[in-house]
């Protein structure tokens, strides 16, 4: 069935705001026949403040812009070397609940890291994926008219120092991690295809097609 197909866009390195705007336009204009999409992207340095975000968690942004976002959660950082995956899914059509989608995204990351010998886990008290006590992946979603947007951000081989300018996801002193601390060969180029393969597997391997950005 055509509607089961997922279209995949690889967007490369992009500013946050135009991609966010395009994601909103896609979600606002889609109907029950619109195929789902997954967008793979890296962003230029930016702090994004989620709907629950409190200004006091942005400690000293300095030269990095702070942008308000309508995803769930608190403040986080995006930058080159972090793989972002936006999931634009019709949850009703795929018979997925919001909590199920969160669990599916967390498991996608856990499975991707396990392929590289990294033992990661979600936490009941703080969304995302962790290696030990350190956070390696942030999650933030929004649901509109039964469709998801926003998604996850997995730290691959990025500079983690900007996270010190914020309380990541509202947790003071939350330590961040990246895949390259365990695997020097990790890049967004080789992690993105595995993230995609693992989420598709958890969605029961629907047909998918890469489309030009």
UniProtKB/Swiss-Prot annotation:
EC number annotated for this UniProt entry: 2.3.1.181
Record site: Lowers pKa of active site Cys: 135
Function description: Catalyzes the transfer of endogenously produced octanoic acid from octanoyl-acyl-carrier-protein onto the lipoyl domains of lipoate-dependent enzymes. Lipoyl-ACP can also act as a substrate although octanoyl-ACP is likely to be the physiological substrate.
Pathway this chain belongs to: Protein modification; protein lipoylation via endogenous pathway; protein N(6)-(lipoyl)lysine from octanoyl-[acyl-carrier-protein]: step 1/2
Record protein name field: Octanoyltransferase
Amino-acid positions noted as binding substrate in the UniProt annotation, renumbered to this chain: 71-78, 138-140, 151-153
A GO molecular-function descriptor: lipoyl(octanoyl) transferase activity
Keywords: Acyltransferase, Cytoplasm, Transferase
Family the entry assigns: Belongs to the LipB family.
Entry-linked HAMAP family: LipB
């Amino acid at each position: 069935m055509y509607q089961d197909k997922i279209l995949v866009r690889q967007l490369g390195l992009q500013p946050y705001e135009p991609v966010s705007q395009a994601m909103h336009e896609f979600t606002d204009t889609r109907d029950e026949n619109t195929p789902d999409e997954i967008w793979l992207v890296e962003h230029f340095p930016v702090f994004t403040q989620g709907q629950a975000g409190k200004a006091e968690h942005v400690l000293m942004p300095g030269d990095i812009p702070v942008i308000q976002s309508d995803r769930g959660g608190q403040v986080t950082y995006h930058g080159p070397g972090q793989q972002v995956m936006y999931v634009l899914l019709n949850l009703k059509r795929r018979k997925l609940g919001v909590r199920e989608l969160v669990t599916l995204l967390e498991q996608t990351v856990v499975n991707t890291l396990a392929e590289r010998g990294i033992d990661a886990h979600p936490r009941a008290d703080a969304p995302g994926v962790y290696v030990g006590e350190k956070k390696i992946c942030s999650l933030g979603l929004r649901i509109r008219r039964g469709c998801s947007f926003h998604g996850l951000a997995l730290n691959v081989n990025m500079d983690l120092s900007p996270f010190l300018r914020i309380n990541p996801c509202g947790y003071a002193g939350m330590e961040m991690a990246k895949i390259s601390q365990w695997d020097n060969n990790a890049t967004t180029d080789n992690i993105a295809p595995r993230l995609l393969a693992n989420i598709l597997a958890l969605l029961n391997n629907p047909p998918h097609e890469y489309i030009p950005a």
